Amino acid sequence: KRQMKVSRYFLPHILALSTSSPFWMGRETGLKSYRSVQWRNFPRTGIPPTFGTYAEYEQIVRSLVRANAIPDASKIWWDQRPHHLYPTLEFRLCDICTRVDEAVCIAAIIQAIVAKLWKLRRDNMTFRVYPLSLIEENKWRAVRYGVSGNLLDLGKETERPARDLIEELIGWFLDDVLDDLGSRAQVEYAFKILDEGTSADRQLATFRETGAMDAVVRRLVEETMEGVRNGPGTGGG
């Protein structure tokens, strides 16, 4: 459960990189990830609470099952949760990437975060556990602005550009695990996202250039097909 507690800090950073839903019902929403807002209408969603032990989490699940609220733990839909069948930690808050390279990049970042936090624990070090309310503030900023806005640097208690914090995450915090994982190229693709914008940014740019939602849809199809035709590492040029 320690991994789940400390890795919550990075959830908004991951969401910001994946934002891809700026429209709803054919209209601009003013958000980069409206899908995240819609998802919050469901129960048992959002940034997860912390648990002192795994037994505490299991007790919550048992209580919900006994009360007939859920059939099993698969119906807990937090942004991050233990898998109910496998010994894995799921990261579930991402928007839908429209380029294969972006999806691979974000998966590699998540893997690297977990590997780095495990390495810290192995070396008798740790990462601070931050309050849920502060992480939720950053999540809202990611939903609203994607990589174009500011996030809170919770350690320094200051506001900084999301791009700067994500660059630090990759270039400083994760750097020493990337070569061991063999994922440096995939993780560093995030620099391309930071430079060119997310899918949400591209969709908005297309709409403002053309004024046509059909053009946005065509671009989404083209981006998806890049990876289908050519495979990861070749699309998004």
Identify the role of each PLM range.
Residues Y34-G237:
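C-terminal accessory/tail domains of diverse enzymes
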Residues K1-R8, P12-L15, V114, E168-D176:
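Glycine-rich, acidic/polar active-site loops that bind/position phosphate-bearing ligands
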